[in-house]
């Protein structure tokens, strides 16, 4: 009996809890949650949401109910910021997206949904660390924000690569990879790899900027470029991914064959050279990361002591092959400038070693940036920095003045004095500023002691009076000046403003352009196939659409040309059709009714230059309408010709030209011989032969099929009835031809009247009803 009572009590308690949950769900009012009225604008709603979100964010507010409150605030803003959801809620009390149901059904869905959303399980009971507040605090240490990423991570990625994880709440895969991620980042961070974590829920802008559209995502950043990790999340794959981010030419493999060349490169590269001797055949990742961090200051090489061909180096430099040994060489390749040897080299030890040896003993000033680093501006009297500058000529081998200057620098190394040298022929303005009398030092070396006063180039300096030849007396004088300078800084009595140094090691313009182009192509390739596929879709759609239109136009045009050639019949077939009274038109009347594309008629002169393109190789289906004129009738005939043919310029198959009768009479008369009947041909020795007037003639030339149609000016009413017809040769052969007689010449009427019927002839040309005169081949136009 007692057990039954206890069961009833538990049932009653469960029902009571469910009722309370349902009532709380029904009582959910987004306006009340955000503290705004039902008539509030979107600006007021957004302002209230931002204020409450900052106040109740679980990462900032440690109140136990902050998480539930923040969820309610987010849900309320989601409803009220969407006009459709807001209207649905105002009418039916429903915050859902389905609006096609009736009011009662919507209310039932509303009750069930809000009951589900307000019934939470205790995550700690199931040990599911979904919430970022209860998740391992290791991610909080590396959380990135957009401003931090842009201002710090991107610039720092030029010195070290970054490995970034994109995560979010309620991400099962994120939980699955977390143990591996924790192990790998602890290992890589000790090697010098930057680590970052982006929460996609709170930093959507940064996640979108990185191109991460799903969680979890892992990406690497180096030199400002983003690369995504696409393999299984295991330790070896992540290490290989970080190693693949680094350039492949950071570390050079050195053996007995090339170590002299490698170490001798200090003069050309103006850098110290570092050699690591180790027993592993693969270059350690720590050494590669160090080489990337200091690539602008030193050159790095690696010697695998287990390989044959390294015995000479190990013996010469007394290397212990059982422990990693790091050597740095400067101007002397016979002995290292510094050495460290340890079985477990840490990053901090290597960084300290490299920092001490970043520059040569007497480095060459090759850029303004290097000048600022070697000769910094003084900040106080206790932080004075002096630069002893050797101005010398460039030589392929070490000159005696430079060797003496180098030995002096080695013997007098101080914290407040830096020794540098400048090639006076490469930095002419810089050298002339420091030399009081450049002619006296022509072809000789000189030494100046200077101190920079500001970043604008103002310096105080003292130049040795005599040229520097490297003798013992020169060294004694320079040493005396340096000793005196410690006691009296006023020794530097001269003052000047130095010009900026030119960058001697900068690549030429073509190389810079090539590198920029290759980087741009690489970025586009990565963006298309890896990083931002969704963002690239509009651009890809535009490119493929343009290519489709382009190739589609070419293909259609090609098929159109082939159809024209296929439909064209041979001259013999056309002659047979003409004999039976049937002609095959090459143009349609629709062409004549096209609206002109331009407000003018484009008429070109037919010369020996344009003859081939405008006639001989004219495309199939195209014709060239040529007006015959002389120099005296050119202006008037062209004006009338343009008026007559203007309505036909809408056809793309017609081209218009004019031919000078004074230049090409023989060519014209050769063509007209094919337009004559059996009547006697005038003899060329006839006295009227050269006086024949062809001005006003119009020829329609089909270059592909080798035929033409002829228009002749008409004189009488009877003759005008046959205008443009080439079929009645007997009645039109000699019409319009002047024999030089006033009674039958054309001088009695205006010149423009010759083309008064040309438009009618053009219509018949487009109909295909004109007679065609075929020729075997087009004559040359001399």
Curated annotation (Swiss-Prot):
- Composition bias type Polar residues, residue spans: 583-593
- The record places domain Thioredoxin at 119-247
Q: Which residues are glycosylated?
A: 631
Gene Ontology BP annotations: regulation of autophagosome size
Basic and acidic residues biased stretches: 563-582
Q: Name one Pfam family in it.
A: DnaJ
Record's bilayer topology term: Single-pass type IV membrane protein
Its GO CC terms?
endoplasmic reticulum membrane
- Spans traversing the lipid bilayer: 536-556
Q: Which residues form the signal peptide?
A: 1-25
Where in the numbering of this chain does the J domain appear? 29-93
Q: Which residues lie on this side of the membrane: Extracellular?
A: 557-782
Which loops or segments lie on the Cytoplasmic side of the membrane, by the record?
A: 26-535
Q: What are the entry keywords?
A: Autophagy, Endoplasmic reticulum, Glycoprotein, Membrane, Signal, Transmembrane, Transmembrane helix
Its annotated compartments are: Endoplasmic reticulum membrane
Is the keyword Endoplasmic reticulum in the record? Answer: yes
The annotated region (Disordered) lies at 562-593
Q: Which residues form a coiled coil?
A: none
Its biological purpose: Plays an important role in regulating the size of autophagosomes during the formation process.
Per its record, how is this protein called by name? Answer: DnaJ homolog subfamily C member 16
- Its gene name is DNAJC16
């Amino acid at each position: 009996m007692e057990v039954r009572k206890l069961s009833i009590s538990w049932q009653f308690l469960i029902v009571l809890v469910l009722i309370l949950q349902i009532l709380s769900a029904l009582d959910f009012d987004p306006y009340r949650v955000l503290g705004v009225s039902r008539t509030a604008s979107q600006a007021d709603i957004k302002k209230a949401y931002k204020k409450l979100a900052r106040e109740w964010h679980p990462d900032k507010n440690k109140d136990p109910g902050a998480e539930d409150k923040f969820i309610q605030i987010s849900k309320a803003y989601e409803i009220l910021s969407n006009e459709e959801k807001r209207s649905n809620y105002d009418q039916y009390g429903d915050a859902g997206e389905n609006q096609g149901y009736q009011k009662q059904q919507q209310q039932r869905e509303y009750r069930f949904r809000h009951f589900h959303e307000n019934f939470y399980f205790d995550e700690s009971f199931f040990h599911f660390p979904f919430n970022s507040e209860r998740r391992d605090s290791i991610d909080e240490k590396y959380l990135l924000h957009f401003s931090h990423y842009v201002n710090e991570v991107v610039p720092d990625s030029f010195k070290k690569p970054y490995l970034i994880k994109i995560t979010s709440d309620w991400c099962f895969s994120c939980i699955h990879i977390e143990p591996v991620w924790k192990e790998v980042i602890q290992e890589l961070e000790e090697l010098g790899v930057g680590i970052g974590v982006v929460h996609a829920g709170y930093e959507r802008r940064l996640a979108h900027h990185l191109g991460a559209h799903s969680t979890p995502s892992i990406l690497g950043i180096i030199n400002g470029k983003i690369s995504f990790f696409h393999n299984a999340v295991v330790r070896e794959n992540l290490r290989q991914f970080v190693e693949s981010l680094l350039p492949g030419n950071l570390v050079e493999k050195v053996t007995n064959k090339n170590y002299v060349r490698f170490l001798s490169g200090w003069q050309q590269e103006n850098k110290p050279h570092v050699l690591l001797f180790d027993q592993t055949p693969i270059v350690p990742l720590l050494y590669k990361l160090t080489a990337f961090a200091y690539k602008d200051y030193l050159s790095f090489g690696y010697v695998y002591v287990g390989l044959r061909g390294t015995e000479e180096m190990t013996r010469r430099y007394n290397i212990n092959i059982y422990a990693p040994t790091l050597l740095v060489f400067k101007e002397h390749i016979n002995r290292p400038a510094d050495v460290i040897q340890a079985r477990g080299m840490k990053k901090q030890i290597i960084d300290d070693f490299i920092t001490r040896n970043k520059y040569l003993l007497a480095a060459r000033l090759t850029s303004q940036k290097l000048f600022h680093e070697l000769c910094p501006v003084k900040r106080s009297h206790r932080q004075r920095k002096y630069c002893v500058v050797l101005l010398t000529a460039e030589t392929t081998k070490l000159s005696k003045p430079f060797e003496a200057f180098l030995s002096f620098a080695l013997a007098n190394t101080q914290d407040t004095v830096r020794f540098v040298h400048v090639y006076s022929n490469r930095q002419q303005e810089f050298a002339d500023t420091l030399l009081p009398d450049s002619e006296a030092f022509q072809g000789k070396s000189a030494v100046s002691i200077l101190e920079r006063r500001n970043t604008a180039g103002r310096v105080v300096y003292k130049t040795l009076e005599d040229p520097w030849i490297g003798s013992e007396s020169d060294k004694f004088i320079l040493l005396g000046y340096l000793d005196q300078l410690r006691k009296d800084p006023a020794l530097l009595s001269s003052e000047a403003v130095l010009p900026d140094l030119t960058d001697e090691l900068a690549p030429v313009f073509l190389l810079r352009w090539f590198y920029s182009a290759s980087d741009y192509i690489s970025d586009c390739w990565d963006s298309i196939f890896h990083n931002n596929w969704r963002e690239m879709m509009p651009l890809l759609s535009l490119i493929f659409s343009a290519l489709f239109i382009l190739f589609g136009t070419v293909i259609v045009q090609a098929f159109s040309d082939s159809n024209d050639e296929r439909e064209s019949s041979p001259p013999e077939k056309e002659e047979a059709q003409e004999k039976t009274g049937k002609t095959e038109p090459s143009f349609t009347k629709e062409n004549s009714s096209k609206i002109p594309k331009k407000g003018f008629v484009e008429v070109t002169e037919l010369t020996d230059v344009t003859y081939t393109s405008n006639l001989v190789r004219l495309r199939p289906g195209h014709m060239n309408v040529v007006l015959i004129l002389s120099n005296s009738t050119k202006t008037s005939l062209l004006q009338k010709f343009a008026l007559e043919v203007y309505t036909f310029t809408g056809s793309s198959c017609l081209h218009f030209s004019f031919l000078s009768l004074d230049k090409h009479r023989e060519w014209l008369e050769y063509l007209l011989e094919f337009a004559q009947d059996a009547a006697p041909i005038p003899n060329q020795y006839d006295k009227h032969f050269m006086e024949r007037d062809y001005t006003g003639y119009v020829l329609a030339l089909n270059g592909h099929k080798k035929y033409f149609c002829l228009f002749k000016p008409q004189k009488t009413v009877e003759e005008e009835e046959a205008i443009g017809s080439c079929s009645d040769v007997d009645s039109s052969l000699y019409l319009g031809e002047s024999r030089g007689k006033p009674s039958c010449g054309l001088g009695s009427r205006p010149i423009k009247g010759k083309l008064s019927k040309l438009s009618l002839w053009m219509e018949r040309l487009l109909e295909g009803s004109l007679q065609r005169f075929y020729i075997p081949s087009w004559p040359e136009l001399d």
